[in-house]
Amino acid sequence: MSQWNQVQQLEIKFLEQVDQFYDDNFPMEIRHLLAQWIETQDWEVASNNETMATILLQNLLIQLDEQLGRVSKEKNLLLIHNLKRIRKVLQGKFHGNPMHVAVVISNCLREERRILAAANMPIQGPLEKSLQSSSVSERQRNVEHKVSAIKNSVQMTEQDTKYLEDLQDEFDYRYKTIQTMDQGDKNSILVNQEVLTLLQEMLNSLDFKRKEALSKMTQIVNETDLLMNSMLLEELQDWKKRQQIACIGGPLHNGLDQLQNCFTLLAESLFQLRQQLEKLQEQSTKMTYEGDPIPAQRAHLLERATFLIYNLFKNSFVVERQPCMPTHPQRPMVLKTLIQFTVKLRLLIKLPELNYQVKVKASIDKNVSTLSNRRFVLCGTHVKAMSSEESSNGSLSVEFRHLQPKEMKCSTGSKGNEGCHMVTEELHSITFETQICLYGLTINLETSSLPVVMISNVSQLPNAWASIIWYNVSTNDSQNLVFFNNPPSVTLGQLLEVMSWQFSSYVGRGLNSEQLNMLAEKLTVQSNYNDGHLTWAKFCKEHLPGKTFTFWTWLEAILDLIKKHILPLWIDGYIMGFVSKEKERLLLKDKMPGTFLLRFSESHLGGITFTWVDQSENGEVRFHSVEPYNKGRLSALAFADILRDYKVIMAENIPENPLKYLYPDIPKDKAFGKHYSSQPCEVSRPTERGDKGYVPSVFIPISTIRSDSTEPQSPSDLLPMSPSAYAVLRENLSPTTIETAMNSPYSAE
């Protein structure tokens, strides 16, 4: 089943997550129509190869043209219109930057895999539970309900203000009518009494309505103040925490559109309220009287409403997408000097008057004194205007795409880190400033990214990413740049949940409870990973017992191995991966001979091995583990092909493949058949093919096991011998001679 078909079968809560990352950059219609073709292209490689990206973009447009031809025959007018529009947008947007479309599509496919993995994982860790609590959802609904109620109340006071204006005009008309009456009519006692009574009643009604309107406006200001400080800003902080979690591989964060709707409605309501207060001032200027409530209350209400507007705007300026290098989309907030990164800002108050009128300036470490001697400046376009065209949903946004951090030389002439921290523990901040001028108000806004780590060499990326993980799982403080002076510990349950996210986001499949238990045992003697705490040093700085590397270095090497060499096998769930040798033997001891499992090496960085079970002649259960394969060997031969072609020479027997069933009882070819690069090579005699022909050759993974040993002596050595030549040797040499040659000290050369 294709990945897209699997996505379409997800529950609605997961489909909503999928909907979040499909926009005009890569419309879902294209994903649906070209699903099979899209999934067979290597978009990740193309995202770093301009030539390949250009070819894929052209092929994508060709595929669209073919779809257009098909739907034209079906006379589907709406689909024809949409496809033509999409093709025009894609060609215009990506013609000069084909690598960007590869990055976008690669990210979408990766997020699909992560969501599919999350949907299939029964485990929900403490961090994810906290983000999905029912109280949070209830508060979201309450915020939206109260914002709507405030908007309705302001509409009511708008009607009250107009009624007051009409009432005052009527009073003014009657008063002026009296002034123009004949002197005789004015002297009439009856007429005079009636007119005075009428005017007094109208004045009393006017006074009552003014007080009533001001009372309603006061209530609106009070409710808005309470809503903002007790619920709306809490909701914004929750979104920022969800963003932190999503940045380190957790569930996709959403809810920003709902927040924008609330912020915008409140801003519109407050500006409308200010206009109503200005109208009341005009009415009071035209006509006032003793005890008039407008002069006594209007100024204070206007001041409070204006303060709320300032506060609302200051909180509405957010970093929608944190700084990230396009070449490493799964490692946001790690930036390399002189390499471009992207970052996106958004104003949650969407007013048409602000489109293209708000210019944002980016800077780094503004007014911040870091512990490092390293100082940076931003090169590239660091001032841009916000516009609704920057976003598919019309929000007021700005995206910086060409910023580059450049390290400055210190005044002493030194360069680099001379403080107490490693470079990968130094935190920096990117600040964004703008000014809003609207309806007579001038509001200065400033916001900052989450802390970023600056590296000068890609080899520093793994440890820099570890710092980003630890920071964002440990604190909600977005500006604690001295965090690593005294980094707090985290619970083991939290950390292991984040480790599972690394696998689901980076290689498309998270970890199950058994795998997490093994990691827990690796980090501590406890197997219950919901309890206990872990320090930063234990995670990333101290070597594992008896090893020359840290826990994080070991895990990162496994992630890299999966990503580059065994990704399809991992996604299919056929790699048990994290299992100790002791547990491995418990699992295999009662299984059929030839049953094997795949696990990651605990002693070799970035290594994967397989262990199989068989029986000796006297019925004794034996276990054999091949020397771990690393990325060097896997670059020469695909792992699935190794499992298919692996041979063992044991005692006087001919070479045979001992791998029959993937644990627990899956036939090997059924599990891995679709990943074989070709059909198994048949061993045959060499044939005469003339001067122009060659005898075909293949790499054969082969091991020898002595009769007095249960372990392969030359595990995973690749024998560069043609099948034909090997067949000739078998016919002309005895098994003993072949075994002697295989055991030669030169056999592994």
UniProtKB/Swiss-Prot annotation:
Residues found modified as Phosphoserine: S722
Record text on subunit structure and interactions: Forms a homodimer or a heterodimer with a related family member. Interacts with ARL2BP. Interacts with STAT1. Interacts with JUN; this complex efficiently interacts with the AP-1-related sequence of the IFN-gamma promoter.
Annotated GO MF terms: DNA binding; DNA-binding transcription activator activity, RNA polymerase II-specific; DNA-binding transcription factor activity; RNA polymerase II cis-regulatory region sequence-specific DNA binding; sequence-specific DNA binding
Protein name: Signal transducer and activator of transcription 4
Record family assignment: Belongs to the transcription factor STAT family.
Residues with the Phosphotyrosine modification: Y694
Metal-binding listed as a keyword: no
One GO cellular component term noted in the UniProt record for this chain: cytosol
Alphabetized UniProt keyword annotations: Acetylation, Activator, Cytoplasm, DNA-binding, Nucleus, Phosphoprotein, SH2 domain, Transcription, Transcription regulation
Function in brief: Transcriptional regulator mainly expressed in hematopoietic cells that plays a critical role in cellular growth, differentiation and immune response. Plays a key role in the differentiation of T-helper 1 cells and the production of interferon-gamma. Also participates in multiple neutrophil functions including chemotaxis and production of the neutrophil extracellular traps. After IL12 binding to its receptor IL12RB2, STAT4 interacts with the intracellular domain of IL12RB2 and becomes tyrosine phosphorylated.
Compartments it resides in: Cytoplasm; Nucleus
UniProt note: phenotype after gene disruption: STAT4-deficient mice are grossly indistinguishable from wild-type mice. However, the development of T-helper 1 cells in response to either IL12 or Listeria monocytogenes is strongly impaired. In addition, mice are acutely sensitive to methicillin-resistant Staphylococcus aureus (MRSA) infection.
Main location: cytoplasm
PANTHER family to which the protein is assigned, alphabetical: SIGNAL TRANSDUCER AND ACTIVATOR OF TRANSCRIPTION (PTHR11801)
